[in-house]
Regions:
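P-loop potassium selectivity filter motif centered on the GYG triad
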Residues: 96, 102, 210-218, 308, ...
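Transmembrane helix boundary and interhelical junction motifs in multipass membrane proteins
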Residues: 130-135, 215-219, 230-232, 300-303, ...
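Hydrophobic alpha-helical transmembrane segments of multi-pass inner membrane proteins, especially
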Residues: 1-197, 237-297, 322-326, 346-366, ...
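Transmembrane alpha-helices of multi-pass inner-membrane enzymes
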Residues: 298-343
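Long extracytoplasmic/lumenal interhelical loops at the membrane interface
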Residues: 209-246, 266
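Re-entrant/interfacial helical elements at transmembrane boundaries that shape
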Residues: 137, 220-226, 254-255, 297-306, ...
Length: 378
């Protein structure tokens, strides 16, 4: 977060101060999330609630008077002058829905029904032109299903279906629903050919990274403000320009290590519900990093997904803090499981030692002889 604040102060002081204040409030609020999860263990059975709440929250972006269109996507709403991106919070509800449904899956029919509900989330996101979120939700769900079933066929089949859906959708709707995506793909394929139009964002992003080089031009000495949406979608390019590609690689390593730590917590958790939740959070987290940095470096088309805890965006920061708080709760469960295991292990060892001590005392030569003699004399 400090990296994000530093860059935001460089780009836009007003936005940096706003994000700092709201993120501080979010940190305090998120401190209570592990306590709330501990008080409500029945959340694992709220599958229908998570599904309905998530879908209804997404639908608010389609309501005239509430919805806002920014950067080609209608995935924002405005309440009392405050811009909110429902997708950032719905992704948490989606993960909880997926986890609660996978815990109860006993038949293939149930898996199909749950998959249809998951697709409903994604269809609404398609109507909002938020294809980055669609990809994020889809990969997260496929990976959670794979973890729950341990069947690679579901993961392979899911990815194949995604590719097929993209191809068919492109053919059928390339001049309407997918027009926004076509612009981004064209800018991705050859940004310098459309440098003054569709490829302006990507070309300036690449110029910024190239200008900074390996060690950067120095904080305050570059021109990251020339990069469009540098405070959000392309903040990684701004960081590389002034702090260097080396610093950018270090930032990527921080994200990867965080992902590994969260995935490790998930794998150690014996509670299947929170195991799936934490794993889903870890996948969502690292996929956001991939989509943002991949778009900024022209590895993939730009998706508009924010860089967790670095990009400007109150909704993004709040949702990421909430996810970290949930992982923290899972970590407490794992710690408790380890403590219980160690206590049980210690109890068993002590019991075995006492048993061996009694056997040794009963079989000792000095004890057996005299006791028999006293018995005979009596």
């Amino acid at each position: 977060m400090l990296i994000g604040y530093t860059m935001l102060l460089r780009l836009n002081t007003k936005l940096a101060v706003k994000q700092f204040i709201l993120a501080s409030v979010g940190l305090i609020a998120c401190a209570f999330i592990p306590l709330l999860l501990g008080k409500f263990p029945q959340v694992r059975g709220w599958r229908n609630f998570f599904a309905i709440a998530g879908i209804l929250f997404l639908i608010t972006t389609l309501i005239p008077g509430l919805k806002m269109t920014m950067y080609g996507s209608s995935n924002w709403i405005s309440i009392a002058g405050i811009s909110i991106q429902p997708m950032e919070f719905v992704k948490i509800l989606f993960i909880f829905f997926a986890a609660s449904s996978l815990v109860k899956v006993n038949e293939f029919k149930e898996l199909v029904i749950n998959a249809c509900i998951a697709i409903a989330f994604m269809l609404i996101l398609i109507l909002e032109n938020d294809f980055g979120a669609v990809f994020l939700f889809y990969i997260t769900y496929i990976m959670m299903v794979y973890l729950a079933t341990s069947r690679p066929i579901f993961a392979i089949g899911g990815i194949a279906m995604m590719v097929l859906a993209i191809f068919v959708g492109y053919i059928l709707c390339k001049h309407s629903l997918f027009a926004h995506i076509i612009v981004r793909v064209r800018a991705w394929k050859d940004p310098f050919a459309y440098q003054q139009t569709d490829g302006y964002q990507v070309s300036e992003s690449l110029f910024g990274i190239g200008t900074g080089g390996f060690i950067g031009s120095g904080l305050g000495r570059g021109m990251p403000y020339l990069i469009p949406v540098a405070e959000s979608d392309f903040i990684f390019s701004a960081i590389c320009e002034e702090m260097g590609v080396a610093f950018g690689l270090e930032l990527i390593l921080i994200y990867v290590s965080s992902f590994i730590a969260m995935a490790n917590v998930a794998m150690k958790c014996k509670d299947p519900f929170y195991k799936y939740v934490t794993f889903g959070i870890s996948v969502t987290y690292i996929m956001q990093v991939f989509l943002n940095i991949g778009g900024a470096t022209k590895f993939i088309p730009s998706t508009g997904v924010t860089l967790p805890l670095v990009s400007y965006g109150v909704s993004s920061v709040f949702s990421t803090l909430i996810m970290f708080a949930i992982v923290q709760y899972t970590y407490t469960l794992v710690s408790k499981e380890v403590d219980d295991f160690e206590d049980e292990k210690y109890r068993i060892i002590q019991k075995a030692r006492r048993q061996r001590a009694r056997e040794f005392a009963g079989n000792a030569p000095g004890n057996a002889g005299p006791s028999r003699e006293r018995t005979q004399n009596q």
